[in-house]
Regions:
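Short glycine/serine/threonine-enriched helix-capping/active-site loop
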Residues: 51-54, 98
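Acidic, PIN/NYN-like endoribonuclease modules and their adjacent C-terminal/linker elements
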Residues: 2-13, 124-159
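Alpha-helix capping/helix-boundary segments
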Residues: 22-23, 55-56, 102, 123, ...
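Short, well-structured N-terminal submotif of metal-dependent ribonuclease cores
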Residues: 1-51, 68-83, 156-159
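Conserved beta-strand segments of alpha/beta enzyme cores
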Residues: 48, 92-94, 148-150
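Short, flexible helix/strand-to-coil boundary loops that buttress conserved ligand/catalytic motifs
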Residues: 27-28, 63, 110, 145-146
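Active-site neighborhoods of divalent-metal-dependent phosphate/nucleic-acid chemistry enzymes
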Residues: 89-137
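Phosphate/NTP-binding elements of NTP-utilizing enzymes
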Residues: 59
């Protein structure tokens, strides 16, 4: 699927799966951490963006461990309040349920050296299941390409 842009060039319209770190960068308005090509993809309203319910679980776990420096834990006294705000502010992201099909794919993925995060395997499995490239800042994700994932790796910059 695609369209011809104003300059006469063919422009492919894409679906993208977002890793938790990208969701949080968007929520906290830290665009300076995004490479120009990734930022361009994320700002293009012709693209569609998806995430896994596993990312919501990861956000809840990060909240529980008080890993967010940019939020007031008195205002967000429960993790679900933070998740609700993230989902309302980033309404262009459709959250998809993690189901049996994704669990089966995750069970076939094998960890690469120095990477043991089961949430990451679940999120990658979800992207594989949906046949979408995943946008992530996790430098381990590209090491899974041989296992069927398509990764758009964003090397964080702190300009």
């Amino acid at each position: 699927m695609g369209e011809i842009d104003a300059g006469g060039s063919f422009r492919r319209i894409m679906n993208y799966f977002l890793d938790t770190n990208i969701i949080l960068i968007l929520f906290f308005n830290r665009d300076n951490e995004l490479e120009p090509t990734i930022l361009s993809i994320l700002r293009d309203n012709r693209n569609s963006f998806f995430a896994s319910t596993v990312s919501l679980l990861e956000i809840a776990q990060l909240y529980r461990r008080r890993k967010f420096k940019d939020i007031d834990y008195k205002v967000f006294d429960t993790g679900d309040k933070l998740i609700d705000l993230i989902l309302s502010r980033l309404e262009e992201i459709e959250v998809l349920p993690f189901e049996r099909r994704e669990a089966r794919i995750a069970s076939r993925l094998t960890f690469v050296p120095n990477h043991k995060d089961p949430n990451d395997l679940a999120i990658m499995a979800h992207a594989i299941s949906e046949q979408m490239p995943i946008i992530s800042c996790d430098d381990k994700f590209p090491e899974y390409i041989s296992q069927g994932i398509i990764v758009l790796y964003n090397k964080r910059s702190t300009k």
